[in-house]
C-alpha cells in the first residue's frame, strides 16, 4: 500500500471515531480522514484524490444513492463503500446500480471492514497504474508516429504515411469508444 487516502463519512460521531481508529491502527499506510456529512464532503471529494470512500448510507441532507452518483460523476473509478444499518435488498440494488463498490451491514466485523477497504484501495492503486501505463504508451506511440512521419517525409512517401495515420487514428477512436 502506498499512503492512500481513505475518507470515512458518518454523522454518528462515536461510530465515525471507531471506524477511523480501527483503520488508522490496522492500515498504517493509509491516511484516514473523517467527515460528519456526506453532502459537505462532496466538495472535498472533488478536490482531493481518495483511494476509497466509506460512507454511512443513512445521511441527512443527501440519500446514499444520489451521493454515490455524485461521487461517480466526479471520479468514475473511485470505490464508494456504503454502510447499511440493516439489510435492504432494494437499497443495495439501487446503490450497486448507481456504482457503489461494496455494501457492508452494521455492525461490520473488523476483518470484513479491513478486507473491503484494503480491496478498494488496491483497486484504486491498480487503476492508477493502468492510467499511467496508458499515458506512457500513448506518448510512446505518438513519438513513434512522429518518427515515422519524418521518415516517410524524407523518402517522399507522405501520402502513404497519411493513409497509415488515418487508419491508426480510426482504430484508436474505435478502441476508446468501447
Residue positions per predicted region:
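Receiver (REC) domain switch/output surface
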Residues: 26, 113-125
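Two-component/phosphorelay signaling modules centered on CheY-like receiver
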Residues: 13-33
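Acidic, metal-coordinating helix/loop segments flanking the phosphotransfer/catalytic sites
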Residues: 34-52, 62
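Short amphipathic alpha-helix used as the core "switch/output" element in two-component signaling
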Residues: 43, 65-77
